[in-house]
Each structure stands twice: as C-alpha cells, then as structure tokens.
Amino acid sequence: MAAIKPITTYKGKIVPLFNDNIDTDQIIPKVHLKRISKSGFGPFAFDEWRYLPDGSDNPDFNPNKPQYKGASILITGDNFGCGSSREHAAWALKDYGFHIIIAGSFSDIFYMNCTKNAMLPIVLEKSAREHLAQYVEIEVDLPNQTVSSPDKRFHFEIDETWKNKLVNGLDDIAITLQYESLIEKYEKSL
C-alpha cells in the first residue's frame, strides 16, 4: 500500500552546491510561504541565489549552469537545512526536482521533512562528496545503503525506520493504516 513513490535504486544527474550552513530561509525565502499546498514552490527554491535582481537566471549559480540542468541529486556542504523548521524547504526542493540530497550533515528537522516528502537525505564525508561531484551521474542503492560513481562506492547510514518508509513508499498515514484492524479492534473494545 504505497502512498509515496518508493526509493530503492536511483540513478540521477548531480549538481554540486558546496556551501555550508544553507538554512531554510536560503532554500525558500519566507516571502514565498503563502501557499498551503505542497506544490508550486520549485520556482522559488534558492530564490536569492538563483536569480539576478532583474529576475533573470544567475549564470554563476551552479543549478543554473547548462551542465547541471535537470539534476535530481544535490551534493552540498555541512549543516544543510538549518534554521527555522519550515517544511516548505523540503517541498521547494522536491518541487524543483531533487530526489536525493547528499550533505555532510543535516538539521534534524529538515532531515525528517525530507523523508516525509519522499526525498532521501544522505550523509557522507567531504572527500566522498567531492569525489561524487566529479561525475555527471551517480547511483544510489537505498536497500544496500550505497552511493556509487563509475569507479567508487560509498556506504551511508540511515535509520531503519526511515529506510523502511522510503523503500516501501510509506507515509505516516499508510503506516497507520497497516494497523487498521488493531485500531478497529481496540475501538470496538471501548
């Protein structure tokens, strides 16, 4: 009973953005938080870096460079997603097209928001991230917890609960529904 698209193996194009301490306000500025649905935030992801004052694309911002167009794996620095606990940041990155974010570390709340929105946050050492950033595409194998370039494989850790949710495409509601018969049995006993 998958409620979100499961993630098992994923091959995608990368874009490096090696800034440390990218906070949720840099990911999605608060001025754009007026929507109540999860969609429509992609055009505002990294708004202040992505666009020049006249509204045109900033050619120096990596995700705007031609070689990174269509990237679905973001490789970034340490402490990604720090700052306020806005889930809109995860929504913006997902709507932009990212499925996987590889960083040195994540804010705990942002990490959880990624997994709740079917994005895989992966923690890797700087040397591994620098190696992976040399390639156009890399492959992630969630069941085996590896990230691979054509010539090297890196292991990553993930809590079994988050892994189970992502591999099986389960959101919180789908997990609750797994216990529906027990819930009904309990309700009848009242």
UniProtKB/Swiss-Prot annotation:
Q: Which UniProt keywords apply?
A: Amino-acid biosynthesis, Branched-chain amino acid biosynthesis, Leucine biosynthesis, Lyase
Its subunit composition reads: Heterodimer of LeuC and LeuD.
Query: What SUPFAM superfamilies does this protein map onto?
Result: LeuD/IlvD-like
Pathway the protein contributes to: Amino-acid biosynthesis; L-leucine biosynthesis; L-leucine from 3-methyl-2-oxobutanoate: step 2/4
Q: Which residues form a coiled coil?
A: none
Q: Which GO terms describe its cellular component?
A: 3-isopropylmalate dehydratase complex
Catalytic activity annotation:
(2R,3S)-3-isopropylmalate = (2S)-2-isopropylmalate
Q: What class of enzyme is it?
A: lyase
Q: Does the keyword NADP apply?
A: no
The record, for Gene3D superfamilies, names:
Aconitase, domain 4
Q: Name one Pfam family in it.
A: Aconitase_C
Natural source organism: Staphylococcus aureus (strain NCTC 8325 / PS 47)
Family according to the record: Belongs to the LeuD family. LeuD type 1 subfamily.
What does the record give as EC number? 4.2.1.33
Protein name per the record: 3-isopropylmalate dehydratase small subunit
One Gene Ontology molecular-function label = 3-isopropylmalate dehydratase activity
Please name the CDD domains in this protein's record: IPMI_Swivel
Return the PANTHER family for the record: 3-ISOPROPYLMALATE DEHYDRATASE SMALL SUBUNIT, 3-ISOPROPYLMALATE DEHYDRATASE SMALL SUBUNIT 2-RELATED-RELATED
Sorted alphabetically, which NCBIfam families does this protein's record hold? leuD, PRK01641.1
At the top level, the lineage of the source is Bacteria
The task this protein performs is described as:
Catalyzes the isomerization between 2-isopropylmalate and 3-isopropylmalate, via the formation of 2-isopropylmaleate.
GO BP term, example: L-leucine biosynthetic process
The family database entries (InterPro entries) matched by this protein are listed as: 3-IsopropMal_deHydase_ssu, Aconitase/3IPM_dehydase_swvl, AconitaseA/IPMdHydase_ssu_swvl, IPMI_Swivel, LeuD
